[in-house]
Regions:
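Conserved structured catalytic cores and adjacent interaction surfaces
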Residues: 1-86
Length: 86
């Protein structure tokens, strides 16, 4: 079968957490799914994150962060999947 790409943007409250999660995510790649981490950063989910996700068909995963007001507005119209965990 064909390998599917899963593009991911990871945001967290601190950079070290984001980097650790990105490394764990990359290890989830297998012969069916290739996890591609496009961005890892600290801070709330921004409109720029949503725009990158929309243009690259990525999902955004946030840990101890939330989308800011602009990101919330844009994610709906762009159809971007944003998942937050705390």
């Amino acid at each position: 079968g064909e390998v599917k790409d899963l593009n991911v943007i990871i945001k967290a409250d601190v950079q070290g957490t984001a980097e650790a999660i990105a490394e764990s995510g990359k290890r989830l790649s297998n012969k069916e799914v290739q996890v591609r981490v496009l961005r890892t950063a600290s801070g709330d989910i921004s409109e720029n994150d949503v725009n990158l996700a929309a243009s690259s068909e990525a999902i955004i995963i946030g840990f101890n962060v939330q989308p800011d007001a602009n990101a919330n507005r844009v994610k709906e119209s762009a159809g971007v999947d944003v998942r937050t965990y705390s």
